[in-house]
């Protein structure tokens, strides 16, 4: 077994850029330490090990951010990012209060602009909106979209199982729709997009379904390596098990931590179009951009998800990055990264007007 692990590590190093390999290998090491065999999680140690950055009202590389609690009853917080306003850099400490007191009550903008509601990854268990990797990613989204990003600090498993993350996502969407500054173009609602990676992509899907059910307009969904599963193993799961950072044993642990205690992996949260799932034909479901890493062991599931949406009559664009692994979009050091950022920018612009 040790020899097999060494072969997998060496193969991985030949494909993955060094900085990405180090980053994700460190995550994997810490994740293995934090997960307990009995299904519980070392939360205090996990919080200590998670590299985080504070919000910055004073601009950093042209982007300002601030944290805001949107549901006191569960302590649900979001981090809001926007392009720095003129004069922000000179305001110093005074800028800390201005966004919260004034930005949330700004008058509607004259032109449509994207608002990306983002759900961080971490398999429903790890990371947060303030994790360094996701703070950086959201800043990139602001720059490429010239809009606003609302990153959701949803409740995590195993302390908060299904459907807590979905409920928090829905709360965030409703909150965004209620804010004066989230309006544009003759007082119309701003153009809202749902996005996330890993478990965040899964959350984005389920929030998008609820939005379609309840008549809330979402302009598009952007899913990066969305986390789906099922009881029957796919070809890519068998072929890539343990080869590029992730094992089936890892994935099974996370699903057991998130799903209801008596559920298996064909629960609709995990397998939305599986035997217990629901088809979306006839539903006004938003257009989707689905980013798939060819070396992610769940890539077959993501492609099957896209096929199911198409079969139900929905618009889907799949960008399949054959030689990319999980997390490739976190660092700007591959051709795939730049291609995907361009695809995201094009998708936002194409769906901004309706």
UniProtKB/Swiss-Prot annotation:
The active site is at residues 198, 296. Its main location: nucleus. Disruption phenotype: Severe dwarf phenotype with wide and dark-green leaf blades. Plants insensitive to gibberellic acid (GA). InterPro entries: AB_hydrolase_3 (IPR013094), AB_hydrolase_fold (IPR029058), Carboxylest/Gibb_receptor (IPR050466), Lipase_GDXG_HIS_AS (IPR002168), Lipase_GDXG_put_SER_AS (IPR033140). The keyword Hydrolase applies. Keywords: Gibberellin signaling pathway, Hydrolase, Nucleus, Receptor. A motif (Involved in the stabilization of the negatively charged intermediate by the formation of the oxyanion hole) lies at residues 120-122. PROSITE patterns: LIPASE_GDXG_HIS (PS01173), LIPASE_GDXG_SER (PS01174). Changing residue 196 to D: In gid1-1; abolishes binding to GA and ability to degrade SLR1. It is an enzyme of class 3 (hydrolase). Gibberellin A4 binds at residues 122-123, 134, 198, 327. The keyword Protease does not apply. One of its GO terms (cellular component) is cytoplasm. GO terms for molecular function: gibberellin binding; hydrolase activity. It is found in: Nucleus. Its EC number is 3.-.-.-. GO terms for biological process: floral organ morphogenesis; gibberellic acid mediated signaling pathway; positive regulation of gibberellic acid mediated signaling pathway; raffinose family oligosaccharide biosynthetic process; response to gibberellin. Gibberellin A3 binds at residues 122-123, 134, 198, 250, 327. Belongs to the 'GDXG' lipolytic enzyme family. Functions as a soluble gibberellin (GA) receptor. GA is an essential hormone that regulates growth and development in plants. Binds with high affinity the biologically active GAs such as GA1, GA3 and GA4, but has low or no affinity for the biologically inactive GAs. Upon GA-binding, it interacts with the DELLA protein SLR1, a repressor of GA signaling. This leads to SLR1 degradation by the proteasome, allowing the GA signaling pathway. Interacts with the DELLA protein SLR1 in a GA-dependent manner, resulting in subsequent SLR1 degradation. This is Gibberellin receptor GID1. It comes from Oryza sativa subsp. japonica.
